[in-house]
Amino acid sequence: MSASPLLDNQCDHLPTKMVDLTMVDKADELDRRVSDAFLEREASRGRRITQISTECSAGLACKRLADGRFPEISAGGKVAVLSAYIYIGKEILGRILESKPWARATVSGLVAIDLAPFCMDFSEAQLIQALFLLSGKRCAPIDLSHFVAISISKTAGFRTLPMPLYENGTMKCVTGFTITLEGAVPFDMVAYGRNLMLKGSAGSFPTIDLLYDYRPFFDQCSDSGRIGFFPEDVPKPKVAVIGAGISGLVVANELLHAGVDDVTIYEASDRVGGKLWSHAFRDAPSVVAEMGAMRFPPAAFCLFFFLERYGLSSMRPFPNPGTVDTYLVYQGVQYMWKAGQLPPKLFHRVYNGWRAFLKDGFYERDIVLASPVAITQALKSGDIRWAHDSWQIWLNRFGRESFSSGIERIFLGTHPPGGETWSFPHDWDLFKLMGIGSGGFGPVFESGFIEILRLVINGYEENQRMCPEGISELPRRIASEVVNGVSVSQRICHVQVRAIQKEKTKIKIRLKSGISELYDKVVVTSGLANIQLRHCLTCDTNIFQAPVNQAVDNSHMTGSSKLFLMTERKFWLDHILPSCVLMDGIAKAVYCLDYEPQDPNGKGLVLISYTWEDDSHKLLAVPDKKERLCLLRDAISRSFPAFAQHLFPACADYDQNVIQHDWLTDENAGGAFKLNRRGEDFYSEELFFQALDTANDTGVYLAGCSCSFTGGWVEGANRTPCNAVCAIIHNCGGILAKGNPLEHSWKRYNYRTRN
């Protein structure tokens, strides 16, 4: 049905002034003012409106929609004119306002969309995603800072896009209209103002699986120095902490600050810090090899809280691929990727496709799945409901996918992000080599798709940093802090715990020496393998519920190997060589690290092998570090001899200046970190919420990064201790600070969905 000729004609004779709403900064007021502007514009049409009213009385119906699309003039239920919004930057708006008459040509080619700038169920990032899918044009937030409200004829071409915009739990569709001058499709510019859709905040934000931000709680408790306390008439518990990694140290420290006097930490190894392990070289103590955690994203807000608290917040960028000159070796051919530039042409399809996916999401059949950027934006802006519902859709549709099958489904389907279908196995192998920002992800392709996607949404793949002092300085400073006259380190017993058992109302700890001790509460921060095999905690349901036991026993622990080499000089600077190398051989990822940037003549440090899973398992067959280094050097030499010729230890000292570690064979670890396989995200849920399950509190609590949704990241090792400490204080009659995780109303997900 064509639009009313009167409406078409009236749009050709535009009024001389739009309503200026740029000073309006409240969504509800903008809603009212925009609606009033449409009403006033219709009233000004005089004779034409009179005649339209006559048509209405003859069978046309006029109505205002609740979401701000006003007015609609319809016949037989088919809309003739409705409202829409063109989103533009301040500069484009200025050009329009300076033109007389209104410069319709300025907005030609743009897309008007039926989402109002006062819509609080839609974020700016979602708007960017929708406009790209409707127009094929990319926008930055600065390009969408303002809007022009228009009345547009239904004769304009339109496209409807199903997107996860929720109102009372229902899916809504977004409609876009292409603004063109051809065909004289009528539209009328009515008002202009600022886009008030939700924008990201500059502060911390919750992770997608928790939707609770621990950082504000820690900040709030900084004033009092404690997250809870015990009234004078309440007896304090006797507590054992198993493991002196970062989780165990945080637990002990927070309990001591809360007034718990009797705290004992049991550590099986001869050092503290666990996987926060910085090896200092004897001849250059300021050069440190990070044997465990080494990349620290600013989005790890709790980690940075503790770094700031202990004076370690000075960080430097980690030399990830593409952020520094990077040498790529694929099938024996060498490619140079200059810092800050696009990768070599061979890699463009996978590079552009992945980045398009991050911004644009995935269009599959009947729905657009929210882009990772849009979900992150929702978390930043506090739109928790939308973030939750969008993530649940990803869980529903991709929860049973491996990272490999998920990538195949997205990039080999009919709507591949970036517009180019990937080829198999060529693009597959290129993507495995290049990765998603922090190096090749090929070895973890069989991990769950959701497991990798959550890292992206949580911001852990962005702006990763390195700690100049070595990250083990953090657990060292926590351990050296004196609380109530005694340091945390003085409470550490370096002995292995062989069993943890219930004994009436107490918990019995049996040590390797045969000695047993009774405690009121126990926090276990050991690796999952030790919880099962050494502590024997999953043999029955006396301590943990069956689903928790299952999660401990079956969660996948990733194998990882590192080999560091300290060189006589920073040869990559001397000879202008790339400081990052990615290869498809046994030496997967090589990083050159400078811990003494102020000294050009200082020692160099090369992480010559950082491998995961199968690539790590292969290296276990070569346990001798000198032999392993020779194998890696020879492999690099075949493609990059100019680099390999410098890979010899300073002073030819293989004993002191080469260090390696295999986390899978570490008897106190049993793997580097937890990485869920497809369909196993409910294991993380069971492990994380165990300490918060007050209905099944047995006095034993789990903590540690492997008991979080972010295995392998220090952030999880800082949040789970908070859960355990809160549980102990609460269960023993203490008083917790407001806003604690125990009193939070958790918005849980269904992780056991079927595709």
From Swiss-Prot:
Its EC number is 1.13.12.3. It catalyses: L-tryptophan + O2 = indole-3-acetamide + CO2 + H2O. Keywords: Auxin biosynthesis, Crown gall tumor, Flavoprotein, FMN, Monooxygenase, Oxidoreductase, Plasmid. Binds 1 FMN per subunit. One of its GO terms (biological process) is auxin biosynthetic process. Its cofactor is FMN. FMN binds at S247, E267, K275, R295. It holds the Pfam family Amino_oxidase. InterPro entries: Amino_oxidase, FAD/NAD-bd_sf, Flavin_monoamine_oxidase, Glycosidase, Trp_2-mOase. SUPFAM superfamilies: FAD-linked reductases, C-terminal domain, FAD/NAD(P)-binding domain. It is an enzyme of class 1 (oxidoreductase). Transmembrane segments: none annotated. Pathway: Plant hormone metabolism; auxin biosynthesis. The keyword Iron does not apply. Substrate binds at R295. GO terms for molecular function: tryptophan 2-monooxygenase activity. Belongs to the tryptophan 2-monooxygenase family. This is Tryptophan 2-monooxygenase. It comes from Agrobacterium tumefaciens (strain Ach5). The lineage of its organism: Bacteria, Pseudomonadati, Pseudomonadota, Alphaproteobacteria, Hyphomicrobiales.
